[in-house]
Amino acid sequence: MKRLKLLSFVVLALLATSSASNANTDLLTADDLVGVSFWVISMGLLAATAFFFFERRSVSSNWRITLTVSGIITGIAFINYLYLRNVYVSQGEATTLYRYIDWIITMPLQMIQFYLILAAVRKVPKSLFWKLLIGTVVMVLAAYLGASENIPTIIGLTISIGAWVYILYEIFSGEAGIAAAKSGNKPMVSAYVSMRTIVIAGWAIYPLGYVFAYITNSADDNLLNIVYNMADFINKIAFGLIIWTAAMQNTTTRNR
């Protein structure tokens, strides 16, 4: 019963947000691939958010916070994508700058997940939490400042990539990488490696998009929106599902 109440609350809250967001917008045409991609990811994010919150009580207590954060990530992205969709339908475009509203919150939360899954199976220093958080905030903030021309675009890109390289070092060879290798928890290590792959491969799309949009000015806005939409769909939802899989495997092993 508690699960059903929680699921109902999450779905109703998100649908209420959706209704308010769509109150005064034009209709989406069926042949508009960009607009359709906004709807596809919005519905996927809504479903993922409900799923992660619903599944919290299916896993052991030390893993619940990871699913809570996964639900928060997809929930924030869902709300922002409704806004992006409305901007696109009403104005015919949705610039990348609007996406930073989402990224400045969700990407640091995704990096914090590395700390949380490690903390679920072993003791890790709190300093790791702050390293991952600050590194990711700098990465996104520098890119935003460059994209909005508050600082030179090339400087914004350089700082952002530098911060990205720093957090990659942390999760591959730094404190986080060492802690994962020593954990001895196979489901967690498997999830950690998969999440790490998303951060290096999936996140590479964002600086590439920055280069085409703000450095060379050669990006097709519609294509860029579709690529970003699909990247966010995979990066955010897959990230959470990977964590859920590890949480379920650890819970099953613990209950044997």
Task: Enumerate the language-model features and the residues they cover.
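N-terminal secretory/membrane targeting signals
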Residues: M1-A23
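Polytopic alpha-helical membrane-helix bundles and their juxtamembrane interface segments
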Residues: S19-R99, I112-R256
